[in-house]
Curated annotation (Swiss-Prot):
Catalyzes the interconversion of 2-phosphoglycerate and 3-phosphoglycerate. This is 2,3-bisphosphoglycerate-independent phosphoglycerate mutase. The lineage of its organism: Archaea, Methanobacteriati, Methanobacteriota, Stenosarchaea group, Halobacteria. PANTHER family: 2,3-BISPHOSPHOGLYCERATE-INDEPENDENT PHOSPHOGLYCERATE MUTASE (PTHR31637:SF0). The gene is gpmI. The keyword Isomerase applies. It comes from Natronomonas pharaonis (strain ATCC 35678 / DSM 2160 / CIP 103997 / JCM 8858 / NBRC 14720 / NCIMB 2260 / Gabara) (Halobacterium pharaonis). Substrate binds at residues 120, 149-150, 181, 187, 254-257, 327.
Length: 506
């Protein structure tokens, strides 16, 4: 075994105050690594990862930059640039969707996450679509998915009010349904959740109805449900079930939490345990959600050339990607630059995430089982390079539960200690880092913080003998520097397409 890259998803370096679950946790394994190894910090937000200034990073962007070895201009930025340049209406895939609705006297259905979180969508993109519908004279409706995970738990009503103002000015785009992302954006094959969002959109069947979208969210708060958990709700006066005469524009720019609902709406590989019969609407996705989906894409991927996986394959290295199912896409699709298919010599071992409503109920998640599997691989069929993601700091951090997040950090630390011992015994270099912060700011019980942070993340390097090897970590590093660092450490030439630089210096 040559090297292991361990990604502590959501483990940021905060202020160490009462909101910082990372600092509050007992982390003897990580602390020992940081003491023995070469230790530094990396930036994971804004322009350092191809996002607008000040925009917090996320797991998709983080893994994409880690794998690319260079700063990758994000799809969200491409969309925004077109809107700002006044050429958004010229997009061919979007134009065809509007043409379909216009030619068949149908509607365009906009659906996606309505918030300013910037992780899965921008509300400005939805507002631009509403304005475009008005310009085209096409009737439009919106299926609004509320956030509360990448934004404050009860901020959704404000975003809905902003949308209502745009709709009123445009004269189209009324909200037809409201649904929390817990249902509409599941990514762990909890198909019964997806089906509830599907039924509201396609059949206008939902447990609740409200006079307005704002009232729908307010009623959810009254029931004790925050934005993420808003149950599917129909908005009265907008009788707009989905039909074959209609078009759909799914405006999320991030793929992983959009796939399930798109699969159900387009009847792609229906392996769920109930029958669905969606109408043959013209469906367009803002970005490519899956390269196997035969659907029009408004902004096809600009895949990074020669990501880490490709370079390892070209050098005849074997590699193993490991995570629990919540982070499957990140250690495979995103790390590989938007490629679903494994590279030559790349194996994948994904452990199921626990079947619980929210991960504060099981902060350890599947970290022990994931570590067991990794140690088994290292002992029996060790890859040349292991990439492993621990999901806990991010997934539990999103619940806003400080004590659960603290427990999640401690659970990961325990497993990191076990894994580090196995890697050292196998003679591997160890790199430990994170893709963004989260558990480093949990807010307060009165005002829980469930979103990512813009804090830096750790970067720790240990030689096969568990020391810093005389190296230090330079200042000013970003996620784009990780792949070049790993490659140079194991003696693989860094391709010209990787503009990142090694983080290690003597």
């Amino acid at each position: 075994m040559e090297a292991a890259l361990v990604i502590l998803d959501g483990w940021g370096l905060g202020d160490g105050d009462e909101t910082d679950a990372v600092a509050a946790a007992d982390t003897p394994a990580f602390d020992a690594l940081a003491e023995r190894g070469a230790t530094g910090q990396l930036e994971t937000h804004g322009r350092s990862v191809g996002l607008p200034d000040g925009q917090m990073g996320n797991s998709e962007v983080g893994h994409l930059n880690i794998g690319a070895g260079r700063v990758v201009k994000q799809d969200s930025t491409r969309v925004t640039d077109d809107i700002d340049a006044g050429v958004f209406a010229d997009n061919e895939a979007l134009a065809r969707a509007f043409d379909h609705a216009d030619d068949h006297d149908g509607r365009v259905h906009f659906m996606g996450l309505v918030s300013d979180g910037g992780v899965h969508s921008y509300q400005s993109h939805l507002h631009a679509l509403v304005d475009l519908a008005a310009e085209r004279g096409v009737e439009a409706v919106t299926h609004a998915f509320t956030d509360g995970r990448d934004t404050a738990p009860k901020s959704g009503v404000g975003f809905i009010e902003d949308l209502a103002a745009t709709v009123e000015e445009a004269g189209t785009g009324d909200v037809a349904t409201v649904c929390g992302r817990y249902y509409a954006m599941d990514r762990d094959e909890n198909w019964e959740r997806t089906k509830r969002a599907y039924d509201a959109i396609v059949h206008r069947e939902a447990p609740h109805e409200a006079d307005s979208a704002v009232a729908a969210v307010a009623a959810s708060y009254d029931r004790g449900d925050t934005d993420e958990y808003v149950e599917p709700t129909l908005v009265s006066g907008t009788d707009a079930p989905l039909s074959a005469d209609d078009a759909v524009v799914f405006f999320n720019f991030r793929a992983d939490r959009a796939r399930q609902l798109v699969r159900m709406l387009a009847d792609i590989d229906p392996d769920w345990a109930f029958e669905t019969d969606p109408p043959a609407a013209a469906l367009v996705t803002m970005t490519e959600y899956d390269e196997t989906f035969d659907l029009p894409v408004a902004y096809p991927p600009l895949a990074p050339e020669q990501p880490l996986g490709a370079v390892l394959a070209e050098s005849d290295r074997t590699q193993l990607r490991m995570a629990e199912s919540e982070k499957y896409a990140h250690v495979t699709y995103f790390l590989n630059g938007g490629r679903e298919v494994a590279f030559e010599g790349e194996r994948r071992d994904i452990v199921d995430s626990p079947d619980v409503p929210t991960y504060d109920e099981q902060p350890a998640m599947s970290a022990p089982e994931l570590t067991d599997a990794a140690i088994d691989h290292i002992g029996a069929d060790a890859p040349d390079v292991l990439v492993l993601n621990y999901a806990n700091p991010d997934m539990v951090g999103h619940t806003g539960d400080f004590e659960a997040a603290k427990a999640a950090i401690e659970a990961v630390d325990e497993q990191l200690g076990r894994l580090e011992s196995a890697i050292r015994e196998a003679g591997g270099h160890l790199f430990v880092t994170a893709d963004h912060g989260n558990a480093d700011d949990m807010g307060t019980p009165e005002a829980p913080h469930t979103a990512h942070t813009t804090n830096p993340v750790p970067f720790v390097y240990c030689t096969p003998d568990g020391t810093d090897g005389g190296y230090t970590v330079r200042d000013g590093g970003t996620l784009a520097d990780i792949a070049p660092t790993l490659l140079s450490t194991i003696g693989v030439d860094i391709p010209e397409t990787m503009t990142g630089e090694s983080l290690l210096e003597r």
